[in-house]
Swiss-Prot record:
It is found in: Nucleus membrane. InterPro entries: TMEM168. It comes from the Eukaryota. Belongs to the TMEM168 family. Keywords: Glycoprotein, Membrane, Nucleus, Transmembrane, Transmembrane helix. Glycans are attached at residues 111, 337, 533, 598. The lineage of its organism: Eukaryota, Metazoa, Chordata, Craniata, Vertebrata. GO terms for biological process: regulation of ubiquitin-dependent protein catabolic process. The chain crosses the membrane at residues 36-56, 63-83, 89-109, 151-171, 172-192, 199-219, 223-243, 265-285, 293-313, 352-372, 380-400, 646-666. Plays a key role in maintaining the cardiac electrical stability by modulating cell surface expression of SCN5A. May play a role i the modulation of anxiety behavior. GO terms for molecular function: sodium channel regulator activity. This is Transmembrane protein 168. Coiled coil: none annotated.
Length: 697
């Protein structure tokens, strides 16, 4: 007995000590990383102080001494605010502002007369050490998981250091100072571009780095200090391209959730920047040396640039109009926790973004061509504006590209509920006895409420929910289904997915039992679908809560020319009534909707003893399905809806770009592998890409 108690006590003590060591190891690791950041900051402060001291010693400029002493005084105040008054935000803001100012001041002071001085060489090595420590600290923080990525465009540290650097540039002449201030704005745009993971962010980073050390930008006076400022600011957003796990809408949240007026003003502000760049490009016409090349080139590509950027601004304006509509719906359905992703998908934002991505690409191409034609290597203001415009348009292209890739397609749904539980000898539904009417009405109402909840949660446009106790005739159902299957979005194209729900009596072979002895076969429904779908690539998903859905599930697997899925239910025939209630129509709908609308559900479709099991089948080409891509006619309709006639000639260029199909060999191989997977290893849970899943037990 004593041995057992001693063993239990020693075992518990060992576990406690092991856990304590793990906690201490984590704390020590976190502290080490934090101290590494402090070391990088202190090293940078020493480098700045030594650099300013060398310049004061060699030039005897009293302004340097005044700023040096003032800088130390401000940093002392920041330390007092931090340690004695616990004003961390004010202290860090003040210190970051002065770090940016002092580093900028160090950049723009001439050191040509004492480049080989020992103290100046020490300053350079200290700055290089600061770069290495800063990169190492950021990398270790992210690899250890100590960084919490939050949606932001610019952090407070980045903004204040950029402002401080811009203020330091005012010590130069007005023209040179303006050039540097614009360069700082361009650097801020590049940081945002990297943090948003734009498709063209890395090429923009390369272009910025190549152009950064032009003499007209006043960087060569102290390129090491300039490189230190640039790399320290770029490190975090550059590493976050890999380490950040934020989704598209999370990254763009500061912009997408901005107020309506602010987003509209951003379009106006973008237009002013673009116009300024065009005016600065026109200064190239003063160059009479190559007038025979410059004048024709600027005239042709300038007109092309103007047309493309009119389209660009109208595209941004149209995007914000659709986004405002999405915010209205989001505000209305706030209690239902509808995410902006689903709302944008339901409003056809994916189709809009796919077309807009191509149009913005033309704007980027036009800017690159105009910049090359009107290149002015000695004009720092032109170069800075060029570096502002590129990431600005790159961000717009990246936003449309990512939203077009991640958003689900549009969908529309139609539900039919025929509450009949008893059948005549010939298999036709009959009216229920009065004592069962109330129970059946409650169950049918529950099915209607569940499917309406499903449509609302997944932002599926509702065509209708028909409830009929006497059944539907074949002609009535024919007219309703044809009207449902030919529905289109507001922008013109067909919906990506059509969801048809049916709960009612079926025959043993799966046909729907209709009023008057009529039936609806799957072949008949497919014929109507082919007639309405035509050459489009929409999907039809049929959800059956009936006693005989298995025949349709098996039959749909033989279809080869359409994208169709059938989600059905299997009800256990033999069951011990003492252990569980017999399955009824509506039980599957309740569980399936709860599974797809509640992320914290505990429904397990494969558990033993389930009275209602799930089964689904898909057509042979189901895995080939991709969301509807804009066709030539879609682009033409989009053009007529949003843009003036003067821009119509570009529609042919847009259609040509839509028709490009690069990497077709890789896509073909990947398609074959997915077909094999769906035919041989049908997954237990199949994501439809619309937010809900098909399941099988």
């Amino acid at each position: 007995m004593c041995k057992s108690l001693r063993y239990c006590f020693s075992h518990c003590l060992y576990l406690a000590m092991t856990r304590l060591e793990e906690v201490n190891r984590e704390v020590n690791m976190h502290s080490s990383v934090r101290y590494l950041g402090y070391l990088a900051r202190i090293n940078l402060l020493v480098a700045i102080c030594l650099g300013l001291y060398v310049r004061w010693e060699k030039t005897a400029n009293s302004l340097i001494l005044v700023i040096f002493i003032l800088g130390l005084f401000v940093l002392g105040i920041a330390s007092i605010l931090y340690y004695y008054f616990s004003m961390e935000t004010a202290s860090l803001s003040l210190s970051n502002l002065w770090f940016g100012f002092l580093l900028g001041f160090l950049c723009f002071l001439d050191n040509s007369s004492f480049k080989n001085d020992v103290k100046e060489e020490s300053t350079k090595y200290l700055l290089l050490t600061s770069i290495v420590l800063r990169i190492l600290c950021s990398l270790v923080e992210r690899m250890s998981g100590y960084v919490r990525h939050r949606p932001t465009l610019l952090t407070t540290v980045e903004f204040l250091e950029l402002v401080g650097f811009a203020i330091a540039s005012t010590t130069m002449l007005v023209e040179k100072s303006l050039s540097v201030i614009l360069l700082v704005v361009a650097l801020a745009m590049l940081i945002i571009d990297l943090r948003m993971k734009s498709f063209l962010a890395l090429p923009n980073l390369v272009i910025f780095a190549v152009l950064l050390f032009f003499s007209s930008l006043e960087t060569p006076k102290n390129p090491v200090a300039f490189a230190c400022f640039f790399i320290c600011l770029i490190t975090d957003p550059f590493l976050d391209i890999y380490f950040s796990g934020l989704s598209v809408t999370e990254r763009w949240k500061p912009f997408l959730y901005r107020g309506r007026i602010c987003r509209r003003l951003s379009v106006v502000f973008t237009g002013m920047i673009e116009l300024t760049f065009f005016i600065l490009s026109a200064f190239k016409l003063r160059d009479t040396h190559l007038w025979y090349f410059v004048i024709p080139g600027f005239s042709i590509f300038g007109i092309f640039w103007m047309i493309c950027h009119i389209i660009f601004l109208l595209t941004l304006w149209g995007f914000h109009t659709k986004l405002n509509d999405c915010h209205k719906v989001c505000f209305t359905h706030r209690v239902d926790n509808n995410s902006l992703d689903r709302i944008m998908a339901s409003k056809g934002m994916r189709h809009f973004c796919l077309i807009s991505e191509q149009l913005v690409f033309f704007s980027l191409l036009a800017t690159a061509i105009l910049g090359a034609v009107s290149w002015q290597p000695t004009n720092g203001i032109f170069l800075s504006m060029f570096l502002i415009v590129l990431p600005l348009e790159s961000m717009a292209h990246g936003l449309f590209h990512e939203l077009g890739s991640c958003l689900g397609g549009t969908s529309v749904g139609y539900a039919i509920v025929i509450p009949t539980n008893f059948c005549s000898p010939d298999g036709q539904p009959t009216l229920l006895p009065p004592e069962h009417v109330q129970e059946l009405n409650l169950r049918s109402t529950g099915m209607l409420n569940a499917i309406q909840r499903f449509f609302a949660y997944h932002m599926i446009e509702t065509y209708g929910c028909d409830y009929s106790t006497s059944g539907l005739s074949f002609d009535t159902l024919h007219s309703k289904l044809k009207a449902f299957l030919e529905l289109r979005t507001v922008d013109g194209p067909r919906h990506d997915t059509y969801v048809l729900y049916y709960s009612g009596h079926t025959h043993g072979t799966g046909e729907w039992a209709l009023a008057g002895g009529d039936i609806l076969r799957l072949d008949t429904l497919l014929e109507w679908w082919r007639e309405k779908n035509g050459s489009f690539c929409s999907r039809l998903i049929i959800i059956l809560d009936s006693e005989n859905s298995t025949p349709w599930v098996k039959e749909v697997r033989k279809i080869n020319d359409q994208y169709i899925a059938v989600q059905g239910a299997e009800m256990t025939k033999t069951i011990d009534i003492e252990e569980a209630d017999p399955p009824q129509l509506g039980d599957f709908t309740k569980d399936w909707v709860e599974y797809n609308c509640n992320t914290t559900n505990n429904i397990c479709w494969t558990e033993k003893g389930r009275t209602v099991k799930a089964i689904y089948g898909v057509s042979k080409r189901w895995s080939d399905y991709t969301l509807h891509l804009p066709t030539g006619s879609d682009v033409a309709k989009h053009w007529m809806l949003y843009f003036p006639r003067i821009t119509y000639p570009l529609v042919h260029l847009a259609n040509w770009l839509c028709g490009l199909n690069l990497f077709w060999i890789c896509k073909t191989c990947f398609r074959c592998l997915k077909r094999l997977k769906m035919s041989w290893f049908l997954p237990a849970v199949l994501d439809t890409g619309q937010g809900f899943k098909l399941v099988k037990s």
